[in-house]
Amino acid sequence: QKKRSRPAELDRASVQAERCAFQRWIRRIDSRRLVFLDESGANLAMGRSHAWLPRGTVLVEPRPRNWGDNLTLVGAIRVDRWLTLSTAWGAMTAVRFADWVEHRLAPRLRAGDIVLLDNLTAHKPRRIRRIIEAVGATLRYLPPYSHDFNPIEPAWALIKKRIRTIAPRTGPVLRATAQRAYHVIRPRHCQNWFAHAGYQLK
């Protein structure tokens, strides 16, 4: 049986206390107010890991060893829909992320929304909080080592599955595939992911 892993830091008393406090707080919040953000990545070497073949045969799929810059995906999700997705070549920086929040996320927020994200350094500039609060929303960071509290994680898995199925081998095709892939996400997916992450559906 394949082993699963989890961060050893979850065993720390301080981390457990933060997670418990977050869970107590979130039970009082209407899940329709929650907006989760996160990043993921894709590259030109992505493809399916399994294939149907006649018994005794082996499929050898050419994949580039030098695939250049990773394609960063940054998106946001609500309990009833995928909110927005953008792509950019290279690593996510604080400036890039703040620009995305200002131009892509903020116009889609509503007064009273609660924006949640992890503690990545690029997420910490004060400008991000100012942008979010300017539209009447609030910003809150997830507890450390708590990706399981972010319902966008399985969305990335679904998007990457689509990318692996297409197996794009040029930059423009990879980017176009990633930008189209989120259209497979339906409201029922979002609701199931929120429920799986422990959020009560109103």
Task: Briefly describe each language-model feature range.
Residues 1-202:
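Short functional hotspots at interaction and active-site rims
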